[in-house]
């Protein structure tokens, strides 16, 4: 009985297996435009590559799979280059961080490189911010310790006692400086540019900089607002952009890192809501017309 069931399953699966796309057998030099007859193959396993999409007025339609829903043009669609040598197929993505995937042409595997690409970009941004904060902490701490050491050198103490006090103050000041700089509330007057504002300040920033990426949690192309639970879920596109926020006394500023640099200044105590995305797109359109 089990053998009969297995044969029936194989009989049903055979048309599906036979319908799987396979590329040509000849070598394919590195190219941005694979042969039209191979599009079904490449767009099955490298579906985010630009040669799989026709885009017009910001709306993109899949060239191969007609039932695929229309999507908005965003950084999910990347410029790709594909090649084939013997039985090895590979595709490369041209982005800030180059990614590539090599697979067997006759036994390909789907690789969701976009999710990994976004994670790598996010980790790299966080690492850079942490390095900046660490360097600032070290400079400030060394300056303070130098002053404290100079003062204690004038006091009559045993060398061991003086050393212990010096090391204790060094550790204490280092911890305090790190906590202060990494968790600046809105009430402080210290300037600091942050990729991720403190969680307690999210409501403020996401009210006046609602398009910034730190206000959204995105998964599988759908984004949910972190602060306002009644906000409808939206699709992930270039409406959501990378932002950094900073403040100086009562001046709050957020910067949008889009195709051009854009920033908005406002009073922290009397903030002004600005639809900066519309203004940003207007600048981009004007630049494209030049």
Swiss-Prot record:
<keyword id="KW-0732">Signal</keyword>
<keyword id="KW-0244">Early protein</keyword>
<keyword id="KW-0677">Repeat</keyword>
<keyword id="KW-1133">Transmembrane helix</keyword>
<comment type="similarity">
    <text>Belongs to the asfivirus MGF 110 family.</text>
</comment>
<feature type="transmembrane region" description="Helical">
    <location>
        <begin position="128"/>
        <end position="148"/>
    </location>
</feature>
<protein>
    <recommendedName>
        <fullName>Protein MGF 110-9L</fullName>
    </recommendedName>
</protein>
<feature type="signal peptide">
    <location>
        <begin position="1"/>
        <end position="19"/>
    </location>
</feature>
<dbReference type="InterPro" id="IPR004848">
    <property type="entry name" value="ASFV_fam_110"/>
</dbReference>
<dbReference type="Pfam" id="PF01639">
    <property type="entry name" value="v110"/>
</dbReference>
<keyword id="KW-0472">Membrane</keyword>
<feature type="repeat" description="B">
    <location>
        <begin position="161"/>
        <end position="290"/>
    </location>
</feature>
<keyword id="KW-0812">Transmembrane</keyword>
<feature type="transmembrane region" description="Helical">
    <location>
        <begin position="163"/>
        <end position="183"/>
    </location>
</feature>
<feature type="repeat" description="A">
    <location>
        <begin position="1"/>
        <end position="160"/>
    </location>
</feature>
<dbReference type="GO" id="GO:0016020">
    <property type="term" value="C:membrane"/>
</dbReference>
